[in-house]
Amino acid sequence: MTIMRKKHPLLKLINNSFIDLPTPSNISSWWNFGSLLGICLAIQILTGLFLAMHYTSDTTTAFSSVAHICRDVNYGWLIRYMHANGASMFFICLFIHVGRGIYYGSFMLLETWNIGIILLLTTMATAFVGYVLPWGXXSFWGATVITNLLSAIPYIGNTLVEWIWGGFSVXKATLTRFFAFHFILPFIITALVLVHLLFLHETGSNNPAGLNSNSDKIPFHPYYTTKDLLGALLLLMVLMILVLFFPHILGXPDNYTPAKPLXTPAHIXPEXYFLFAYAILRSVPNKLGGVLALILSILILATLPILNSSKQHGLIYRPITQTLYWIFITNILVLTWIGGQPAEYPFTTIGQVSSILYFTIIIILMPITNTVENNILKLH
């Protein structure tokens, strides 16, 4: 069997990625989130496939087909709530994964980091089109508001919006194409994940100490397979507590009323995981400016390797930048809270200050603290 797994063309790939992969001996539980994301993706694709068997992407029947899944399909309620709450778990793991990458300086693995940013954007797009499918009030107005942002693009904006809608408003054509996008995108994500892993295994994994670990590597199996299994069990435990006890806690009550194009909900707020980006979008009074701020809030991650001037890898021995990092994380939590609040004083002001701070920390303050720490430690 040993010979088989090392010689067979297919098994060799699996062996080199998950069994005999040389891994740093000191990577902590923050490195578990990659495998957890893989598990989340598998759960989402499987539950999504079973939901797609019963769902109809037509404006007249979409809402009732979701109700039918919950009421009449065997364990349909379980599949539906696993899919809905699984998306929230997916994004929580995704944000922790990115946060770990920033903290430990993993962004210096350029190809892996950039593919990761593309993955983040693709996952956000998938979640957005998926949110439209149940065709509740928040789905419909979410689709209208967010697609309408494209009209801010000069010259081609309005044409582009109508082209995406497939008409002069969000309707049957929009729902059908969003379902098609929502079905295909997870497979594109899976392909990108493989590319992400390919680039990661070219350089090897980073580690908490930020030092070269070539002299001290251990095989991935059994050490990290066991560690990942523990993480997976904890993830599934949290997910099942959400699904079985609090299935609606992360949803919007508005989505339990069918979409009505004539009546707008009191507050249009996106899903829990998009609130920080939504707060940044809202804090710019100009429409085009808001759209640019929204896109840049994610794309700014690509500037991290360029702006990094530190001679040390990661923040583990850098208390000043560490403090700044935790201010940054707190600021994102503040933005998340603001995104769920109505657009009125004092929330708008807090949102604007937080949005400015979000960009200032990455573009201005982080590079300054890098230089200061280099000078303190005389690392020229």
Curated annotation (Swiss-Prot):
CDD domains in the cross-refs: cytochrome_b_C, Cytochrome_b_N
Binding-site residues, heme b b562: H83, H182
Pfam families (UniProt xref): Cytochrom_B_C, Cytochrome_B
GO MF annotation terms: metal ion binding; ubiquinol-cytochrome-c reductase activity
SUPFAM superfamilies, sorted: a domain/subunit of cytochrome bc1 complex (Ubiquinol-cytochrome c reductase), Transmembrane di-heme cytochromes
Classification via InterPro entries: Cyt_b/b6_C, Cyt_b/b6_C_sf, Cyt_b/b6_N, Cytb/b6-like_sf, Cytochrome_b, Cytochrome_b_C_euk/bac, Cytochrome_b_N_euk/bac, Di-haem_cyt_TM
Gene Ontology terms: biological process: mitochondrial electron transport, ubiquinol to cytochrome c
Note: Heme 1 (or BL or b562) is low-potential and absorbs at about 562 nm, and heme 2 (or BH or b566) is high-potential and absorbs at about 566 nm.
Protein name, as recorded: Cytochrome b
Organism from which the protein derives: Chilomys instans (Colombian forest mouse)
Gene behind this protein: MT-CYB
